[in-house]
Amino acid sequence: VNEAIFKSAKESVTLCFGLMSILVFWLGMMKIAEHSGLLERLSLLFKPLVSRLFPEVPANHPAMGYIVSNIMANTLGLGNAATPLGIKAMEQLKKLNGNKDTASRSMVTFLALNTSGLTLIPTTVIGIRIHYNSADPTEIVGPTLLATVIATIAAILIDRFYYYKRVRKGIE
């Protein structure tokens, strides 16, 4: 039993260092993209879609920037990097919220999008597959993309369904 415990502990540390190196690489890529202006251009590309998903958020409000950055980080499979951006986005959305005790429409939509987790490049899963010597660590990309696209579409549809249901009842 002791041998298994120490072997598992060693493997956990090795796996964590492997995942950290992948995270550091992608965070570095995000910084390069930020300094080169690529993030700003991508943000402009996504803003029309994001503005439609969050119509109550003014286009130049800081919340919009955090929302777009969070979605982009999640899309690249950088969940750990997306978390602080998501927290900042929620803080900004709370400032915009007139009723502080209840989540706003934008807060609910943002939560639904984050929960669905649209991912183009599942970096963490690829890293784990590399660690365990997978013959093709990237073969997970296609199924992950399909599953997360379906989940994101479902999240948006369900979010809109309940929003319009509340509007018809006069709750919002």
Model-identified regions with their sequence ranges:
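Mid-bilayer segments of alpha-helical transmembrane spans in multi-pass integral membrane proteins
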Residues: 71, 75-80, 114-123, 148, ...
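Juxtamembrane and boundary regions of transmembrane helices in multi-pass small-molecule transporters
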Residues: 100, 140-172
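Membrane-embedded alpha-helical segments and adjacent helix-loop junctions characteristic
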Residues: 2-92
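Membrane-interfacial segments
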Residues: 33, 37, 41, 97, ...
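Alpha-helical transmembrane segments and their lipid-water interface positions
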Residues: 17-22, 121-123, 155-159
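Hydrophobic alpha-helical transmembrane segments
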Residues: 67, 111, 141-145
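Hydrophobic transmembrane alpha-helices that form the pore/transport pathway of multi-pass ion
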Residues: 71-113, 128-134
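Membrane-embedded transport cores of multi-pass solute transporters
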Residues: 120-140
